[in-house]
Amino acid sequence: GEVFAFPR
């Protein structure tokens, strides 16, 4: 449910 994609 995140607007921005961050590397996790």
Curated annotation (Swiss-Prot):
Domain of life: Eukaryota
Record-given protein name: Unknown protein 3
